[in-house]
């Protein structure tokens, strides 16, 4: 065990020496990456339920402000979802669906409206059709919820990379 620790020590010191640091390093809630996220206002998102889910996930992940007067940045997101049957039986009934959620986002300065960064993220999941229509509906909603959280997490990572480089 001691030999393993001694072998890892030079690697850790080398990474520290070259300026490596984790993107979302936490020193409590005072970490710089966490503080900048708190200044982002997430605009309401169209798209019915999934837009609501994406916005709430973004607010939770970013711990963003819900007040436009204290925000430094505005995040606007547009979502598009598609559902297509991927497993079709010989009698033309569908037994599995593919759910695709795409989001295009734009981060802008709240004061002058200048676009700072923008991008697109996509996530794909699937769900089965079962005998119970209610169970199938719940599976679809679960795919939407998981997709919304995944999209929000991907956007958070993109924004973290942007702020790490343009701080």
Model-derived regions, located:
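N-terminal leader/targeting helix
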Residues: 44-67
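C-terminal motif of bacterial Sec signal peptides marking the signal peptidase cleavage site
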Residues: 14-17
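C-terminal/domain-edge helix-coil "capping" segments
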Residues: 135-167
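Bacterial N-terminal signal peptides that target proteins for export
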Residues: 1-8
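Surface-exposed short loop/turn segments
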Residues: 60, 65-120, 124-142, 146
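Bacterial signal peptide processing site
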Residues: 19-22
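Post-signal peptide N-terminal segment of mature Sec-exported envelope proteins
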Residues: 27-47
């Amino acid at each position: 065990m001691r030999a393993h620790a001694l072998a890892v020590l030079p690697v850790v010191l080398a990474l520290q020496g070259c300026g490596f640091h984790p993107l979302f390093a936490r020193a409590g809630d005072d970490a710089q990456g966490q503080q900048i996220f708190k200044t982002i206002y997430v605009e309401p998102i169209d798209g019915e339920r999934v837009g609501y889910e994406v916005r709430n996930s973004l607010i939770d992940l970013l711990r963003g402000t819900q007040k436009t007067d204290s925000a430094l940045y505005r995040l606007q997101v547009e979502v598009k979802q598609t559902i297509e049957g991927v497993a079709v039986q010989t009698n033309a009934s569908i037994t599995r669906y593919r759910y695709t959620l795409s989001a295009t986002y734009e981060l802008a300065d709240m004061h002058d409206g200048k676009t700072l960064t923008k991008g697109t993220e996509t996530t794909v999941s699937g769900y089965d059709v079962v005998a119970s229509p209610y169970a199938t509906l719940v599976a679809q909603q679960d795919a939407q919820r998981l997709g919304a959280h995944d999209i929000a997490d991907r956007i958070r990572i993109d924004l973290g990379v942007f702020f790490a480089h343009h701080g």
